[in-house]
């Protein structure tokens, strides 16, 4: 007879005792279960004990999380969290230095458990830890353990970072600013200051004033990836918390101190692989730097500004008066004005007054900045562009100003200028760190590409939008390759000629047209069930391989890893926490189990409980797109197993696999792409013998039936 649904068979162990094999009734109060376990071992005062998972993070079992106990789980009987917290804190207060280190070694692994953390915090544990950190009697292991325990407790979000004292923050800052410091202390101090900066504007200003940028640069130049990453994290946090004017001053200072060159040579081109966290911080640094262009992009040209009028005149003179000699010398004012209007027309402005062209935002004054940069840093290419096109009379001239304005808009869209930073993106461009003024330099390459493409297309003014579409495709395809330098970008984008773009488009079009013929569609429909079964099998295999996921804390930091996989028999999901940098665990080491039969539904995006309350701003979009949850039976209630996929592809593979596991339709974009690819290959294999044979749109007509079915055989014909 099968045991009731709410009964699980588990083992309970205790040091120096024979383990117990019991049937745990999940409907029975936990206090009653504890009393029964203690009675078996003849232990008094069961309220002084608690159950923990024996493996992994040794989480305390409470009424809220007892549903995580599955058949075969191994538990251990240990000291209750309130008593354990009291014991450790009492020893911490009166112990010697070595005794404090021993207490902290026991405290750190337990601090990640919410139940234990609440007990420590309620007994002023944070205050005791802050005293150890502020005293700084030991700048080695004890300080590192104290910082780690403090961070683990604060990450639960029970206490606000804004409650920290100024003296405490200053002491942590002093550890960052010290020259001779234990290698394990400074990354933890930097991590703490990053959390303070992101959570408290007031304390963030204190950190900004107390931590010199030069000191962060020193940490970045140490060949220690963990220290580099935490220093970059604090740097981007300070930049995000600064006002636009302060941010500009800080970035100008950093570029003058060769931060860009160091990132390019020692981080991007480092022999060691770059971590995800560092890639995210480089993306943030790139986005914040490009964000400095937003005010110019949002500001229209002021026709009454003397400075801006002089810039327009400088642009005209660089093209038509290269030697500084005015062609209008000796002419009347009206004649000179008429000459200027004509020359601005030759420059490619659509209106008689250039100010009218530059009133559009975006790109506003950023387009004028780009044109001036091109004229000053590539004067020969600028003059050749303008004079070559202004001298043509066959309507094939490429308007420089109009092209520059539209191209600036295009570059802002491709590089997401002015958009808020994503909290999870890692999509930075190595080329951005290869040289100064990268946006303007990119414009110089793009405007010459536009002129080249214009000639290849033999375009006229009516073809302007078509040319811009081709240039957008050329730039987008090349940026997607992530070239590491501007010269490499120039080489690749110039190799992608208009003819090559046409070839790519033609290939895609022929591919689409080939799959739209009715006989091909019929064949594809017959192949779909078999290929969908193949995709389903691949998705389930991917689940069996397992994957590392990151946990999101109360401040949505993705800094803890856990592993999840499907058992080979496809009946159980197994999961558990793992350490950063560790190899994926084996199935035997994963003690957490979720039977597939207990799963109710698969939730995605904003329906997930772990992102439902995060708001609806643009910064949450990436998080929503990567979030999914499994709801399952938790006694009579519903519980959730929450995921944040590392990438969009992994999100599709896992949600498809879970849908297949639950018997639902696999409806992701990745499934559609995989099915299309398999259908294309299989169709081509089936049609190999019909190469160069036209496939009719409709089947041949069936001939009419004969007038009668009286078949006749001529018996007069005899065989010889």
Swiss-Prot record:
Any one GO cellular component localisation term in the record: cytoplasm
Q: Where is the ELMO domain?
A: 307-479
Short name of any one Pfam family annotated for the protein: ELMO_CED12
Q: Where in the cell is it found?
A: Cytoplasm
Listed A to Z, the keywords are: Apoptosis, Cytoplasm, Phagocytosis, SH3-binding
Q: Which SUPFAM superfamilies does the UniProt entry name for this protein?
A: ARM repeat (SSF48371), PH domain-like (SSF50729)
One GO term of the biological process aspect: cell motility
Coiled-coil zones: none
Q: Where is the PH domain?
A: 541-663
For this protein, the record's InterPro entries field holds: ARM-like, ARM-type_fold, ELMO_ARM, ELMO_dom, ELMO_domain-containing, PH-like_dom_sf, PH_domain
For this chain, one GO molecular function annotation is:
SH3 domain binding
Recorded hits in PANTHER family, A to Z, give: ENGULFMENT AND CELL MOTILITY (PTHR12771), ENGULFMENT AND CELL MOTILITY PROTEIN 3 (PTHR12771:SF16)
Quaternary structure, from the entry: Probably interacts directly with the SH3-domain of DOCK1 via its SH3-binding site. Part of a complex with DOCK1 and RAC1. Interacts with ADGRB3.
Sum up the protein's function in the record's words: Involved in cytoskeletal rearrangements required for phagocytosis of apoptotic cells and cell motility. Acts in association with DOCK1 and CRK. Was initially proposed to be required in complex with DOCK1 to activate Rac Rho small GTPases. May enhance the guanine nucleotide exchange factor (GEF) activity of DOCK1.
Name the record gives this protein: Engulfment and cell motility protein 3
Q: Which organism is it from?
A: Rattus norvegicus (Rat)
């Amino acid at each position: 007879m099968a045991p009731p649904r709410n009964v699980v068979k588990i083992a309970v162990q205790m040091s120096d005792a024979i383990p117990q094999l019991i049937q745990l009734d999940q409907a029975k109060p936990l206090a009653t279960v504890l009393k029964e376990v203690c009675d078996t071992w003849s232990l008094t005062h069961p309220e002084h004990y608690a159950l923990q998972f024996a493996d992994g993070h040794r989480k305390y079992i409470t009424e809220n999380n007892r549903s995580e106990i599955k058949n075969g789980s191994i538990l251990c009987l240990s000291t209750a969290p309130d008593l354990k917290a009291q014991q450790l804190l009492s020893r911490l207060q009166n112990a010697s230095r070595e005794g404090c280190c021993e207490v902290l070694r026991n405290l750190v692994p337990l601090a990640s458990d919410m139940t234990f953390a609440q007990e420590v915090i309620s007994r002023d544990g944070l205050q005791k830890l802050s005293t150890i950190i502020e005293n700084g009697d030991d700048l080695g292991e004890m300080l590192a353990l104290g910082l780690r325990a403090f961070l683990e407790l604060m990450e639960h979000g029970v206490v606000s970072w804004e409650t920290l004292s100024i003296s405490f923050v200053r002491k942590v800052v002093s550890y960052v600013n010290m020259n001779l410091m234990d290698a394990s202390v400074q990354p933890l101090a930097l991590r703490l200051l990053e959390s303070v900066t992101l959570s408290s504007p007031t304390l963030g200003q204190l950190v900004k004033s107390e931590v010199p940028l030069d000191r962060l640069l020193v940490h970045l130049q140490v060949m220690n990836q963990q220290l580099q990453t935490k220093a970059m994290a604090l740097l981007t946090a300070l930049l995000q918390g600064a006002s636009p004017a302060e941010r500009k001053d800080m970035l100008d200072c950093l570029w003058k101190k060769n931060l860009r060159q160091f990132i390019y040579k020692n981080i991007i081109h480092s022999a060691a692989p770059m971590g995800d966290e560092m890639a995210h911080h480089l993306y943030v640094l790139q986005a914040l730097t490009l964000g400095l262009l937003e005010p110019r992009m949002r500001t229209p040209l002021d026709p009454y500004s003397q400075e801006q009028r002089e810039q327009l005149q400088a642009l005209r003179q660089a093209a038509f008066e290269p030697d500084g000699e005015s062609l209008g010398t000796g002419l009347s004012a009206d004649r000179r004005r008429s000459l200027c209007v004509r020359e601005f027309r030759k420059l490619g402005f659509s209106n008689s007054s250039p100010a009218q062209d530059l009133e559009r935002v975006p790109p506003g004054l950023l387009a004028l900045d780009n044109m001036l940069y091109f004229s000053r840093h590539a004067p020969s290419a600028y003059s050749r562009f303008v004079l070559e096109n202004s001298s043509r009379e066959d309507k094939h001239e490429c308007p420089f100003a109009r092209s520059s304005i539209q191209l600036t808009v295009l570059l802002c869209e491709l590089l997401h200028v002015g958009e808020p930073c994503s909290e999870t993106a890692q999509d930075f461009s190595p080329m951005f760190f290869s040289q100064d003024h990268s946006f303007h330099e990119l414009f110089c390459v793009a405007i010459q590409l536009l002129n080249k493409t214009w000639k290849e297309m033999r375009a006229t003014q009516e073809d302007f939008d078509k040319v811009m579409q081709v240039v957008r495709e050329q730039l987008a395809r090349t940026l997607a390759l992530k070239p590491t330098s501007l010269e490499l970008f120039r080489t690749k984008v110039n190799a992608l000629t208009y003819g090559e773009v046409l070839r790519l488009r033609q290939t895609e079009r022929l591919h689409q047209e080939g799959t739209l013929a009715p006989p091909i569609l019929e064949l594809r429909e017959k192949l779909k069930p078999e290929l969908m079964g193949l995709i389903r099998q691949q998705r389930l295999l991917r689940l069996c391989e397992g994957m590392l996921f990151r946990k999101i804390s109360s401040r949505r930091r993705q800094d803890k890893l856990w592993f999840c996989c499907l058992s080979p028999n496809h009946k159980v999901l197994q999961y558990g926490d793992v350490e950063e940098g560790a190899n994926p665990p084996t199935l035997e080491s994963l003690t957490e189990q979720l039977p597939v039969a207990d799963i109710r539904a698969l939730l995605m995006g904003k329906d997930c409980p772990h992102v439902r309350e995060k708001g609806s701003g643009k910064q949450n979009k990436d998080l929503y797109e990567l979030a999914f949850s499994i709801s399952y039976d938790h006694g009579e209630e519903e519980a959730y197993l929450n995921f944040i996929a590392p990438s969009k592809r992994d999100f599709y593979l896992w949600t498809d696999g879970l849908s297949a596991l639950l018997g639902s339709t696999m409806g992701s974009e990745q499934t559609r792409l995989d099915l299309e690819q398999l259908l294309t290959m299989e169709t081509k294999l089936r049609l190999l013998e019909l190469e160069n044979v036209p496939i009719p749109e409709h089947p041949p007509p069936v001939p009419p039936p004969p007038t009668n079915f009286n078949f006749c055989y001529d018996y007069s014909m005899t065989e010889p």
